[in-house]
């Protein structure tokens, strides 16, 4: 199979891009994809599709208020999107301005504090390095003066509802600048139902970066360089995966961020390594999955690396058929949209 970036394009009517969440977290639709079989369900049906002894792995990252507006020392307006807080006084960011700021220049953000641009950052130099130019703490300043960073395809500014609904109910480790959106469908009652049915849960942390929205700027998929994100897998989660494997249960990743962390830390026997690391894993058709058996995920952007990931997991032709079905049936797309439950049916022979 020889695929290009254009092979992951699909027509999407703009009105199918969800601008607001469903009235209830579990109120979204769920498209169950098992090979060529497509079944339209409700997300509330999920507990009936799992069995006792299965393990759901969630990403417990919490979205920080990463967007700032301000003024450059030259007087021009600037918008800053934090990519990562490195420590209390240093951060990496994206910059939107009429002209990119130079190293050594300063910016006044939220009319409250000043930062200094120290240079370019990131594998391709797409990000900028910041340091505080006065006493302070980026974590505290973000919480006090920052704005919630909604995705670029959501057209309204962050509202009070977004402060709650663009976080998972189990978010506890601050650091993401985009939500792990598959988890947005779970509410406390569903988590309790899953536990009562003997379906186990475990957590890891992967801080989703703004790079998740970056378009691919290459024609050949092999030429793309993935952004890097940091993840942490605690001992309890690694132990839960080992126990699930030994008992014949399935490991179900809640979201592509959980899947990327698990596969990055995976061993050939389906277990995972404990600890923290950086990952720039780029999963495309032909990838051999080692850890994850099923995947819960939202619908992804055309020509995106995440669409390639789900195509690798469930099969390229199956995903194309599923997305065409979703468009025809008026499913809601992207972060606030509906969900999919994917069975792992991709084959190494699908390699691009």
UniProtKB/Swiss-Prot annotation:
Q: Which GO cellular component terms are attached? A: cytoplasm
**Protein family according to the UniProt entry:** Belongs to the QueA family.
The pathway this protein participates in, as annotated, is: tRNA modification; tRNA-queuosine biosynthesis
Question: Per its database record, what is this protein's job?
Answer: Transfers and isomerizes the ribose moiety from AdoMet to the 7-aminomethyl group of 7-deazaguanine (preQ1-tRNA) to give epoxyqueuosine (oQ-tRNA).
Quick one: which gene encodes this?
queA
Q: Can you state which reaction this protein catalyses?
A: 7-aminomethyl-7-carbaguanosine(34) in tRNA + S-adenosyl-L-methionine = epoxyqueuosine(34) in tRNA + adenine + L-methionine + 2 H(+)
Location relative to the cell? Cytoplasm
A GO biological process held by the record: tRNA wobble guanine modification
Please tell me which top-level EC class this enzyme sits in. Answer: transferase
EC number(s) stated in the UniProt entry for this protein = 2.4.99.17
- Quaternary data: Monomer.
- State any single GO MF term: S-adenosylmethionine:tRNA ribosyltransferase-isomerase activity
Which InterPro entries does the record cross-reference, listed alphabetically? QueA (IPR003699), QueA_dom1 (IPR042118), QueA_dom2 (IPR042119), QueA_sf (IPR036100)
A Pfam family it matches: Queuosine_synth
Recorded coiled-coil stretches: none
SUPFAM superfamilies on file: QueA-like
| Protein's UniProt name | S-adenosylmethionine:tRNA ribosyltransferase-isomerase
Q: Which UniProt keywords apply?
A: Cytoplasm, Queuosine biosynthesis, S-adenosyl-L-methionine, Transferase
């Amino acid at each position: 199979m020889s695929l290009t970036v254009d092979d992951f394009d699909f027509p999407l009517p703009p009105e199918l891009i969800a601008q607001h969440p469903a009235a209830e977290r579990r109120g979204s639709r769920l498209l169950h994809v098992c090979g060529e079989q497509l079944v339209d369900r409700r997300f509330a049906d999920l507990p009936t599709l799992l069995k006792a002894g299965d393990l759901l792995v969630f990403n417990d990252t919490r979205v920080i208020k990463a967007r700032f507006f301000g003024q450059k020392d030259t007087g021009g307006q600037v918008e800053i999107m934090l990519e990562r807080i490195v420590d209390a006084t240093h951060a990496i960011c994206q910059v939107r301005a009429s002209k990119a700021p130079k190293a050594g220049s300063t910016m006044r953000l939220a009319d409250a504090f000043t930062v200094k641009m120290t240079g370019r950052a990131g594998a391709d130099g797409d990000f900028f390095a910041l340091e505080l130019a006065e006493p302070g703490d980026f974590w505290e300043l973000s919480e006090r003066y920052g704005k919630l960073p909604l995705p670029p395809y959501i057209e309204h500014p962050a509202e009070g509802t977004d402060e709650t609904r663009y976080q998972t109910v189990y978010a506890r480790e601050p650091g993401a600048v985009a939500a792990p959106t598959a988890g947005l469908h779970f509410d406390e009652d569903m988590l309790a139902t899953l536990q009562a049915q003997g379906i186990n849960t475990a957590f890891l942390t992967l801080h989703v970066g703004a790079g998740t929205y970056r378009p691919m700027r290459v024609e050949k998929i092999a030429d793309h360089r993935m952004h890097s994100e940091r993840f942490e897998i605690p001992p309890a989660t690694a132990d839960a995966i080992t126990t699930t494997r030994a008992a014949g249960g399935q490991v179900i990743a809640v979201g592509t961020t959980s899947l990327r962390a698990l596969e990055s830390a995976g061993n050939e026997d389906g277990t995972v390594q404990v600890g923290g690391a950086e990952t720039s894993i780029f999963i495309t058709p032909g990838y051999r999955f080692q850890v994850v058996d099923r995947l819960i995920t939202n619908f992804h952007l055309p020509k995106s690396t995440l669409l390639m990931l789900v195509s690798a997991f469930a099969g390229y032709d199956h995903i194309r058929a599923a997305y065409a079905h979703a468009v025809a049936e008026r499913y809601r797309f992207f972060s606030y949209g509906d969900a999919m439950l994917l069975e792992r049916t991709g084959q190494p022979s699908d390699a691009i």
